[in-house]
From Swiss-Prot:
Positions with biased composition (Gly residues): 1-10
Compartments reported by the entry: Virion
Pfam families named among the record's database cross-references: Cucumo_coat (PF00760)
Entry's Gene Ontology cellular component terms: ribonucleoprotein complex; T=3 icosahedral viral capsid; viral nucleocapsid
Organism: Tomato aspermy virus
Name the record gives this protein: Capsid protein
InterPro entries: Cucumovirus_coat, Cucumovirus_coat_Asu_sf
Keyword Acetylation: yes
Amino acid sequence: MAQNGTGGGSRRPRRGRRNNNNNNSTARDKALLALTQQVNRLANIASSSAPSLQHPTFIASKKCRAGYTYTSLDVRPTRTEKDKSFGQRLIIPVPVSEYPKKKVSCVQVRLNPSPKFNSTIWVSLRRLDETTLLTSENVFKLFTDGLAAVLIYQHVPTGIQPNNKITFDMSNVGAEIGDMGKYALIVYSKDDVLEADEMVIHIDIEHQRIPSLQRSRCDSTRMHDVRRR
């Protein structure tokens, strides 16, 4: 019996060592998880400014409908003070603009922040009268009248906010390519100065194909090589 007692006592340190090993393993797992999260954040920041199949993400989010393609625009907001707004009308390049009667089905807006971005902005797309001036005073009220969806995008400590795009359905208003100049992208800088190099906004306009774009770029197998014509 004494020997059994001694044997039982000798096993206790081994159980303790196993517990220590488990604790060490848990600590290593936590450290590895933290490192993985940090690497993923850095990868997200790096990929946000590098061309890829996700850039712009219209292709990744959905395919064009049959008979449609898309035209991409890049908007770089100028320096915008806190509580001030920026606006820019959609200017369609040639040869697409030479076919004003082609239908537009939707417009997708995607935000691509630089690593320096650390504030909150509101973004929307509005149809405005040609006489409307896109000054800060005129633009701000467009975010609060409830007549259009607004994307609220903010810096988060863990990395880039995943909800960085918004799609506006244009088919229900019968929009055409010739109407796009009546629409403006508007940006409101809510809680800090938005510097000129902190944000690029990609706009993908899905519209009926035109003769010079025989092949839909949404269906191309080399999407990352296609440039806006």
